[in-house]
Swiss-Prot record:
This is Annexin A3. GO terms for molecular function: calcium ion binding; calcium-dependent phospholipid binding; calcium-dependent protein binding; phosphatidylserine binding; phospholipase A2 inhibitor activity. Pfam families: Annexin. Gene3D superfamilies: Annexin (1.10.220.10). GO terms for cellular component: cytoplasm; extracellular exosome; membrane; nucleus; phagocytic vesicle membrane; plasma membrane; specific granule; vesicle membrane. A pair of annexin repeats may form one binding site for calcium and phospholipid. PANTHER family: ANNEXIN, ANNEXIN A3. The gene is ANXA3. Keywords: Acetylation, Annexin, Calcium, Calcium/phospholipid-binding, Phospholipase A2 inhibitor, Phosphoprotein, Repeat. The modification Phosphothreonine is found at T267. Belongs to the annexin family. It comes from Homo sapiens (Human).
Length: 323
């Protein structure tokens, strides 16, 4: 059965002639003793798929009685450590931890919440919610409820539920109907009916929404983006705009996030690590293409000029090449 975490446009694939015991031993040697063989760690962990890394984690635990992630944490530091630990974490657990981190401490990282919840499939969201409960003994919905409010909270909870339709079939009649409902809920009334926007944008399939947005333009003579900007505000507006952008082109949406993470003073390694790791087996090749198309230079060169050391080497290996 194909994994729900693997697509066809990733940069990282299964390693041929894979042996978890050989890799576990090589990693243990790289970590043990004085000094760490970072090159060895990087070459093994970036050249294996996540499913293969999970087998290495199991083998490592069986052979040495330790958690590989704990040994990596004890031996490495900074951004490089965060990235290597991310690589050995199962995808659903990784996303669950990213969501928790987005809501922990003072202030909520709404951008991260929006990015994760708008780009994961319904089946992935179900896995993430389960992982969240397993790790934190609290439901993802409860934490979202206590950290956010209003229409933004309502929409996030709908997405976190993993109830978006995923069929590829489109229904023209429904698209016309939904476009009409959105028009009446926003442009064509005094005040906005936010619930209608949430219901349609958070539950319909992406192909269905694409058609709905076309119908919307026919009815209103406006793009849905302009209507959302004119009718809504705050994080709720940001969330709905993110959904529209993902419906139209998810790799372009994520390329824009990476561009923001790498632009200006300092690097947003939280976002950079998350997108590079979580999309490395799904659509990172497409994200690279969109990045080059929109910004005139490659993602590879952006990483190269903005990061350094083993952290840079690892990111470039995940990136998988220059464009």
């Amino acid at each position: 059965m194909a994994s729900i975490w693997v697509g066809h446009r990733g940069t990282v694939r299964d390693y041929p002639d894979f042996s978890p015991s050989v890799d576990a031993e090589a990693i243990q040697k790289a970590i043990r003793g004085i000094g760490t063989d970072e090159k060895m760690l990087i070459s093994i962990l970036t050249e294996r798929s996540n499913a293969q890394r999970q087998l290495i984690v199991k083998e490592y635990q069986a052979a040495y009685g330790k958690e590989l992630k704990d040994d990596l944490k004890g031996d490495l530091s900074g951004h490089f450590e965060h990235l290597m630990v991310a690589l050995v974490t199962p995808p659903a657990v990784f996303d669950a931890k990213q969501l928790k981190k987005s809501m922990k401490g003072a202030g909520t990282n709404e951008d991260a919440l929006i990015e994760i919840l708008t780009t994961r499939t319904s089946r992935q969201m179900k896995d993430i919610s389960q992982a969240y409960y397993t790790v934190y003994k609290k439901s993802l919905g409860d934490d979202i409820s206590s950290e956010t409010s209003g229409d933004f909270r309502k929409a996030l909870l709908t997405l976190a539920d993993g109830r978006r339709d995923e069929s590829l079939k489109v229904d023209e009649h429904l698209a016309k109907q939904d476009a009409q409902i959105l028009y009446k809920a926003g442009e064509n009334r005094w005040g906005t009916d936010e619930d209608k926007f949430t219901e349609i944008l958070c539950l319909r399939s992406f192909p269905q929404l694409k058609l709905t947005f076309d119908e919307y333009r026919n009815i209103s003579q406006k793009d849905i983006v302009d209507s959302i900007k004119g009718e809504l505000s705050g994080h709720f507006e940001d969330l709905l705009l993110a959904i529209v952008n993902c419906v139209r082109n998810t790799p372009a949406f994520l390329a824009e996030r990476l561009h923001r993470a790498l632009k200006g003073i300092g690097t947003d390694e939280f976002t950079l690590n998350r997108i590079m790791v979580s999309r490395s087996e799904i659509d990172l090749l497409d994200i690279r293409t969109e990045f080059k198309k929109h910004y005139g230079y490659s993602l590879y060169s952006a990483i190269k000029s903005d990061t350094s050391g083993d952290y840079e080497i690892t990111l470039l290996k995940i990136c998988g090449g220059d464009d």
